[in-house]
Swiss-Prot record:
CDD domains: CMP-KDO-Synthetase. It comes from Brucella canis (strain ATCC 23365 / NCTC 10854 / RM-666). The gene is kdsB. InterPro entries: Cytidylyl_trans, KdsB, Nucleotide-diphossugar_trans. Its main location: cytoplasm. The lineage of its organism: Bacteria, Pseudomonadati, Pseudomonadota, Alphaproteobacteria, Hyphomicrobiales. Pathway: Nucleotide-sugar biosynthesis; CMP-3-deoxy-D-manno-octulosonate biosynthesis; CMP-3-deoxy-D-manno-octulosonate from 3-deoxy-D-manno-octulosonate and CTP: step 1/1; Bacterial outer membrane biogenesis; lipopolysaccharide biosynthesis. Gene3D superfamilies: Spore Coat Polysaccharide Biosynthesis Protein SpsA, Chain A. This is 3-deoxy-manno-octulosonate cytidylyltransferase. It comes from the Bacteria. It catalyses: 3-deoxy-alpha-D-manno-oct-2-ulosonate + CTP = CMP-3-deoxy-beta-D-manno-octulosonate + diphosphate. Belongs to the KdsB family. It is found in: Cytoplasm. Activates KDO (a required 8-carbon sugar) for incorporation into bacterial lipopolysaccharide in Gram-negative bacteria.
Amino acid sequence: MLQTMKTLTLIPTRLGSTRLPNKPLADICGKPMIVHVADRAAAAKLGRTVIATDSEEIFKVVAAHGHEAIMTRGDHESGSDRIYEALAKLDPSGEIDAVVNVQGDLPTIDPDTIRRALLPLEDGPADIATLGVEITVEEEKTNPNVVKIVGSPLAGNRRLRALYFTRATAPYGEGPLYHHIGLYAYRRSALERFVKLGPSPLEKREKLEQLRALEAGMRIDVEIVKTVPLGVDTQADLDRARTFCSQAGTI
């Protein structure tokens, strides 16, 4: 159960964005974006919150704002590899049971949304847990940048057992479609197994890392939430985050 699980929250981040250079350090209402993310992750109160980065500049900025950071290698191909290195350094004795992986470009994410990502690990046998939201905008159903979840309903309509993730419009026929939110919670054993697997055929075809776990027989359960947090990938996204902040008075 969740009460007995020791949890660590990790935020992998780097400066190497091509679409939005120096994205983690972009100013939003007087604070770097990565600091907003760290503030919200810490507010979720899922154990220790640590930023994992290969950038000394990010490390110093995060520390200056009172958050913990750890340096990782610069040659990681994915955030999963980066958080595994951080976990091994932070907890070499293996006391941590579950790791929450929060993307460093979600400055408006609700702390409760982060907390909900752990629920499938608390309630059931999932190896990995993640989040989804029902698609209500018609254009998103055919947008390949909106990743869809194909899954079997669990616990009414608030959770799915993931069978597949795809950029196509799926599943076919009447019924809701679900947008995948790329925030994960891993059992430690699942993360250790996942990073040792090579890229899978469907992962390479769809360009979706989570398919590696499904192809290896790992179970992913999806907690359904009400809203999609704003991910910042472009200048337009950053402008929206700044507008949200100025209108709300804070993120």
